[in-house]
């Protein structure tokens, strides 16, 4: 619940407000500062979910393992691969000559798009995990 809640809160409340309130560059810097903490929440929650799944036993875990795996894979890919690469591109953009900026911006947009897709995948897998948990408790 915390993991899914943090994704919803950041994606639908924090990020939009920051980008609406601050100029684009400052908003990007602020969100860039938040991202490592955001992904850390995912890592910690992922470990806690793993422990919970191990404690529930295989007979009740079932598809929850799949949902958890998708969530972890998406979080780890975004947090340890996509986000650092995007951060490096943002730094390069600051000092890049005007002739190089369009290429760097296009590469950043590609990484941003991938990050958004990974985030959405983690969110939907998390909702699926919550649904699976609710169905099992209902029985």
What do the PLM-derived regions correspond to, one by one?
Residues 1-139:
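Polytopic transmembrane helical bundles with strong interfacial aromatic enrichment
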